[in-house]
Amino acid sequence: MSLLSDLINLNLSDTTEKIIAEYIWIGGSGLDLRSKARTLPGPVSDPSKLPKWNYDGSSTGQAPGEDSEVIIYPQAIFKDPFRRGNNILVMCDAYTPAGEPIPTNKRHNAAKIFSHPDVVAEEPWYGIEQEYTLLQKDVNWPLGWPVGGFPGPQGPYYCGAGADKAFGRDIVDAHYKACLYAGINISGINGEVMPGQWEFQVGPAVGISAGDELWVARYILERITEIAGVVLSFDPKPIKGDWNGAGAHTNYSTKTMRNDGGYEVIKSAIEKLGKRHKEHIAAYGEGNERRLTGRHETADINTFLWGVANRGASIRVGRDTEKAGKGYFEDRRPASNMDPYVVTSMIADTTILWKP
């Protein structure tokens, strides 16, 4: 095993200019991540300098067998924490051979919204709190739970420490460092209310980069759980009953919200979000109705409510923002399995471009 480990950790730059690029794209479910690697002649830092590639879309549920080729366009580059050296991870989006975005390519439309002059001028910042659950392989039951049974009730686990409270910290910490190495603006981690559930935060990130960074952070987490022999779940309510669900709270601000007088702009933006509540809920993740029940720090899915420091609201404004008269707000509705390209661009569209 030590030889295998040595080979995995070989530093290619000692002997060759060539690098390995791992191309990542979103599969047919809209949540599954796929990837494959290719050799390039030397280091690359600009995605536009990378070659397009293709894959068999009939094997990912994205194209018919008789016309199976899907083309992937490189969009963002990150350092590869697994191969290290000059090797890279490449976030791509997917198109037909004719150049049309395929249905699961939500990045294409998001990029249009983020490149609109009115949106560019507002410089939208995002901070996404990605919750997830670690499951025991083969039994699909949370890490640290007795198989077929339950741990003690919620209370001691949130931000807890100790072998009876925190399960999977090695995975969480490995992911944290790997994201920092990759160049992702990961801003923190914490244990969540339900045992076996954790959270990491990405941001502040501007515009389309929030989606790119969150997707690659998810990919890195998938790879680390693969190594650890643990299953990663983004199910918004993995366990029925008196257990917290998993969300992807999205913190948001624009330039005018961050400037003096921004609190009035925030209130106006929240009012617009309330008017499009149903459209946002429809786009905020599968199975969210199991999570947004009005219990376990959520608002009811059919009700739009905002408040200061209220974790039972759809939109929460922090005490610091209220006091300063400017800042940001948190959209607490997105589920853990949401597509960040959809959520971030929709918030920008509703608050900046949409005229009620």
From Swiss-Prot:
SMART domains: Gln-synt_C. Pfam families: Gln-synt_C. The keyword Cell division does not apply. It is an enzyme of class 6 (ligase). It catalyses: L-glutamate + NH4(+) + ATP = L-glutamine + ADP + phosphate + H(+). GO terms for cellular component: cytoplasm. Its main location: cytoplasm. Belongs to the glutamine synthetase family. This is Glutamine synthetase nodule isozyme. It comes from Vigna aconitifolia.
